[in-house]
Structure formats: C-alpha cells, structure tokens
Amino acid sequence: MAHIRKATGVWDWFDQRLAVTKFFKVMVSEYWIPKNISFLWAMGVILMTLFIVLFVSGLMLVMYYKPDVNLAFDSVNFTIMKEVEYGWLWRHIHAVSASVVFLILYIHTLVAIYYRSYKQGREMIWVSGMLLFIIFSAEAFSGYMLPWGQMSYWAAMVITNLFGGIPIVGDAIVEWIRGDYAVSDPTLTRFFMLHVCLLPLVVVAVLAVHFYSLRFPHVNNLDGEEIDFELEGEKYLQGKTSESKVIPFWPGFLAKDFFYVSIFMIFFFYLVGFHFDFAMDPINFEPANSLKTPTHIYPEWYFLWEYEILRGFYFDVGPLKAADIGLIAFAFAGVSLFFIPLFDRSSVVAPAHKNKAFFIWFWVLVIDMILLSLFGKLPADGAELGIENKYWGFALSIIYIGLLVVVLPLITIAERKRV
C-alpha cells in the first residue's frame, strides 16, 4: 500500500494520488523540443486551437439546431442566423474553422513529408496523424449534411451511394448507413449523432494517442539531425541553455507558439468577419429537394482532389466498370498517405532540399494535388486548353498514383544505395 502523508496543499494532495508532477515533467516541462525548428512546427498547436474553437462554437449551435428534415434548414438559416443573438457569428466561426482546419492539416502533413518526419521511430506519429485526418474528414462530411440544403442532400446521396460499389453487401451497407432506402430523416439524425457525439470522442482519443506518440521519438528538426534528447535535456537543466540543442515544451516552445497562434487568429477572424462566404456553398442556401438535382455536384474544396480521382477513370476495363475503377482509385487516394513510410525505402531522415530527386518529387506531388482540386470543381464534360476535363482528370489521377507507388520507391531506393 502506498504511503500517503498529510498534504501540504491541493497540488500535493493530487500529486500523491495521481503523480501530477511527474506527469507534468514527462509531458510538458521536460519534454524536449529541438531549437532548430521554424514557425511551421506551430501547426499542431494551431490545429488544437481550431479544434477547441470548433467544439465551443458547435456547442452554441447545437442548442438551437433541429435534427429533423422539416426543421433543420430553417433552424440554421432563420433561427440561428436571425433570431439567436450573435447566432450568425457562431455559425460563421464554426464554418470558417471547419474549412481552415483542413488548410492547416494539409500544411502540417506536407511539412512532415518535406522533412520526412515519418520514419526512424516516428511511424506511429505519422499513422495517428493520418488517422486524425480521416476522422476529421468524416466529421466534416457529417457536419456538411446538417444544414439540409441542396448540396447537403445531394452530397449525402452521392457519398452514401459509393458504398453500393462494394460487392455483394454494398446495397445493404448503403441502406444501413442511411437508415432508409433513400437519404431522409433517419439519415439526418444518424449523421447528427456522428457529428456531435461519436466522432468528436474518437478525435479526442486519437489526439491523445498522437500527442503520446510524440513523447518518445520527439519531433524532427529543420536539418533532420539526430539529437540525443536526454543528454541535451540534462545540459538545459544544468543551466547550459546556450549549449543545449533543445528547449522544454513549456514554457520555451509554447511561448513561441502562442505568438504564431495570435497571428493566425487575426487572419482567422478577418475571414470570419469579411470572407466567411468562402466556407459556405451558395447552392446550400436552397432547401433540400430530392426532385431537383443540382447542375453540378461537388464536395468542399478540401475533398476536391480525391473527388477528381473518383471520377477520373471514365472507361471500362474488361469486367470492371468505370465506376468501380474510380471507386478503387478513390479508396486508394483516401488511405494512400498512410503508406508513405512504406513507399519511402531509404533510411535517410533529411529535408527534401538535401535530395534533388525527392525535392522534385515533393513539389510535383503538391502541384498535382492542387490541379486535381481545380479540375474537381469543374464539370466533367467541360474542356480546358482544348482538352476535355475527363482526360485531364485521368492524367492527373495516374500521376498521383504513380508518384506514390512507383516514383517514390525508386528515388528512395537510389538514395539508399548512395548512402
């Protein structure tokens, strides 16, 4: 039995029972961060800030939202926007943060790829981070359906129909997800439950795993230098702060991050106040109508590159229909970044600019994803530069898959042989 002495204060009382001092040291005050980093390392704290903003603004909105197909549209566009005091502000904050969180997620992910922060013991950091991306995607989609506008309804119809492509059990899965034969009231209430209850809990759990996985291999640095964190941490604790290559997570690292978060929040509230419309589709201000299909159905900007891969395969191959090939490619695109640690066959942990081939590969990947997003917003039957959009989509989709499955293994195998 543990020896419990009389506590000298509240902190000491908890410390004897929960070891809060030791926990604080391991997770915060003696968790060491390399000095050799830039503002790009602040993206994680910005993401955490946005998650809190989403949670608080979501709480304010859910007080007045009605998860009923006859009431949902009016509860958002009339009750919240016109009758609830500052309801418009909470909706704008929630919509903008839901969109901007993906911008920061993409930056965070691309920085990790550029500096190759997914190998040499950091694989679980990468996997848990990509799992967070998938869960945030599900959270975003379930939330997009709740206003019950035209694009909400038809996006739900298209996305749930995708599961119908699964052999044998596809139709049963679609009906199970919807709770009905068509997108209707049971579908709305199910997605409401996912958005406000289940998925946020999963996000919190995976966030905890992500933060915990950071504590052992520690974060990477600008040069990919291998640092003895225990030795450098001892130097810091001995007062040799200038000699040490590390700083503590608190106050050293977070104090700098608070500055970057402050700058970001200025940009964020500028969007909330003056350009909130970028996060809201005009078509979604029309009530859902199952008898009126929008001229062009497309997802939010952060899913456009995957959507273009889905529709990029416009031809049949033997027994495989175009829709089936597109669905397979779409499924691959959704999980492809999970496997970058496997596709990268080199043991070198160094930024992209130290390997010319990897540097070129990285920027071609970024440009390809941007182009996929641009064409994903355009109608498939249109044409750009005299070439039909479907051909552009197919070419860009093949380039994306080839960059990951073929090019990345080849250039990293060549790098491994040079080392």
Predicted regions and their residues:
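Membrane-embedded and interfacial regions of multi-pass energy-transducing membrane proteins
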Residues: 2-100, 104-419
